């Protein structure tokens, strides 16, 4: 019955899902839980060497690549240029990861214009709201100028560094609230959601022109039939070290996601975890593609053997 619902969305509502490349269904290594913002290119290259040997087919480089600041928050979002300290040779770095047989995806926070970003002065008066706890404002995409700027940043990232995809975070922050300015004549959309759909459809088309197999990830809380129009990877919401939440999240996503790739939240564990505990965590991801986020260089050999066994098992089945 639920399968028919997914078909109904596509056939009757004309909500056609994005193309799902084979790479979207492969296991990925993620930097978020293992490193947070403390990342740099040589360190990640060593991790990728180990990950590739185990069968991981891609890396998702999360928050931190765009700033030297490691204090969390989103004050430096908006410019979307690699940190010259952490990633001084970004293009060569991506090429090296490609040479290992792995895809390369970068995290971007779509809505945030950070107060410490270079673009802040230009767009600080075109915000849906300012979030003090984030040290950033939410871009008002009812302005064509804002949409074009955001799209240009993401297209340039993919083009300039030969990226295979983007992890697009916080899309749910695009909404109207008490602080949202009223519509004015300089806007070409009245409704934020209409502007968002228009931008995302355009962006997906632009990215596919660069790479027909572009990978786009969104996570739970902002998933549904419409998000599948421009996203081909749907991930379980953040649930670090919660095995049951990961399994339930995978099942929930699989029920109505059709052919769209479904990924686990990034699996992690305590450094003192026994092999049996690691095995249980990995087993809970059997219903989708694995994302892993532990420092492989620091794992004991017996832990690496468990990961390798799991990877071989999932590739077989």
Language-model features, listed with the residues they occupy:
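Beta-strand-rich recognition/accessory modules
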Residues: 1-18
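Aromatic-lined carbohydrate-binding/catalytic grooves of carbohydrate-active enzymes
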Residues: 25-29, 33-155, 159, 165, ...
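Non-catalytic C-terminal accessory modules of carbohydrate-active enzymes
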Residues: 299-317
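Short acidic/histidine-rich active-site segments
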Residues: 167-174, 216, 220-221
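Glycan-recognition surfaces
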Residues: 114-145, 152, 194-300
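Hydrophobic, well-ordered secondary-structure elements that form the walls
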Residues: 97, 169, 285
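Proline-aspartate-enriched helix->loop->beta-strand connector
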Residues: 162-163, 212
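Alpha-helix-loop-beta-strand connector modules within alpha/beta enzyme cores
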Residues: 87-102, 188-211
């Amino acid at each position: 019955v639920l399968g028919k619902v997914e078909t109904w969305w596509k056939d009757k509502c004309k909500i056609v899902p994005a193309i799902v490349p084979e790479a979207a269904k492969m296991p990925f290594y993620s930097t978020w839980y293992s490193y947070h913002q403390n990342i740099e290119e040589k360190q990640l290259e060593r991790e990728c060497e180990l990950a590739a040997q185990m069968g991981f087919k891609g890396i998702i480089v999360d928050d931190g690549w765009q700033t030297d600041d490691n204090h969390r928050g989103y004050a430096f979002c908006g410019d979307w240029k690699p940190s010259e300290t952490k990633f001084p040779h970004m293009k060569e770095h991506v090429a090296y990861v490609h040479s290992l047989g792995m895809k390369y995806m970068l995290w971007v926070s779509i809505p945030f214009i950070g107060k410490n970003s270079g673009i802040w002065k230009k767009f600080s008066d075109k915000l849906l709201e300012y979030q003090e706890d984030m040290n950033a404002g939410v871009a008002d995409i009812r302005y064509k100028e804002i949409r074009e700027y955001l799209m240009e940043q993401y297209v340039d990232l993919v083009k300039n560094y030969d990226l295979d995809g983007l992890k697009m975070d916080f899309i749910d922050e695009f909404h109207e609230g008490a602080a949202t300015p009223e519509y004015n004549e300089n806007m070409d959309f009245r409704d934020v959601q209409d502007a968002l759909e228009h931008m995302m459809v355009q962006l997906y088309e632009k990215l596919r022109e660069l790479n027909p197999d572009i990978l786009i990830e969104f996570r739970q809380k902002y998933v549904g039939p419409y998000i599948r129009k421009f996203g081909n990877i749907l991930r379980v919401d953040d649930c670090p070290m919660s095995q049951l939440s990961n399994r339930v999240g995978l099942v929930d996503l699989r029920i109505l996601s059709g052919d769209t790739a479904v990924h686990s939240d990034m699996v992690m564990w305590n450094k003192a975890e026994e092999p049996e505990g690691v095995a249980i965590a990995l087993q809970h991801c059997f219903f989708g593609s694995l994302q892993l986020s532990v420092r492989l260089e620091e794992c004991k050999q017996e832990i690496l053997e468990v990961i390798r066994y799991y990877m071989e098992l999932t590739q077989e089945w």
